[in-house]
Amino acid sequence: MFLVRTTLCPAGWRTPASVKQGHSVSEPTWKRYLVDYNEGLGLVYERLVLNDYLDRLLKKHHVQTVLEAPLFGMAGVSGINSVHLAKQGCDVTLVDVNAERLDGIQRIWGELDLSCRFVLREDLTHLPFDDDSFDLAWEWAGLWYLPDAAALLGELVRVSRHLVFVAMPNRLQVGYWLRRILVDKEFFKTVDERWVNMGLIKNALEKQNLRIVEEGVLDIPPWPDTVMPAAELLRRLGIRSKRLERQFSGDDWQWSTMDYYLGKRPELKDIVDGYSFLERIPLPWRLKVIWAHHRYVLGSKR
């Protein structure tokens, strides 16, 4: 079954208890960030440089209708990857497998005063949309959580009338292996690592007759990608320093993309731009791959 919600969440709205919960993506973590918007500098950076890429995509291609399916993958606050597209006037549809999370995301979009179509769908091997329904279908960093990522990629191609954009963590970068070998080994027992292989992703898309028109790297700040707050990373590395602990925690260390979207901290974009020199260096992307946090492909049906 699927549940479509096309308006902002009315007061008192609740998901029916009969709706079965779908896939779990570190439930305690995503539940926390439905109410705690302090994501950390790394995630604010990731979101805002992704927005820059999406802006370039909108300038180059005619994109009015957008599907993000599934909406999970990026850490931090769930369901806000497509907020910038909505702010640019796109008609956005989001798909999730978890009713509780989708309820929270609908409330978050209400805080932003943005409209969006919210779709609850447990079975991602067949999305509830007609062929050629969206100008852009995309997914960020969620494939390795899925029981059948290849089927989802096929569905993104089917429902797109033009573009398909897919990004995944870059397994060639230093932070990936720091996380995998040293600081977060247990996480990798919960995902299907085959789907960080960009060759596998491209092959799956090309089998659906999608033409790959661009590939590259995104999210290249001057720090490694460990997908955890700096204070937690120091703790797991056994580094105990009250000075560093104070520096990377407390009221003075607050980083919230929601604050940026709500107009509370407009200076965050300038801060991110100050760190994004590696994104802008005019070098081939293959030379940046050892440090870039994500790799992506863009395909076209035309």
Language model regions located:
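Class I SAM-dependent methyltransferase SAM/SAH-binding core
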Residues: 65-126
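N-terminal, positively charged/glycine-rich alpha-helical extensions of SAM-dependent methyltransferases
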Residues: 1-38
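Short alpha-helix
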Residues: 192-215
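Conserved alpha-helix/loop element of class I SAM-dependent methyltransferases that forms part
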Residues: 43-65, 80, 84
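Conserved catalytic loop of SAM-dependent methyltransferase domains
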Residues: 211-263
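A short SAM/SAH-binding and catalytic strip from SAM-dependent methyltransferases
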Residues: 135-147
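Conserved class I S-adenosyl-L-methionine
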Residues: 162-195
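A short glycine-rich, Lys/Arg-flanked "PGG" loop and its adjoining helix->strand segment in the class I
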Residues: 150-165
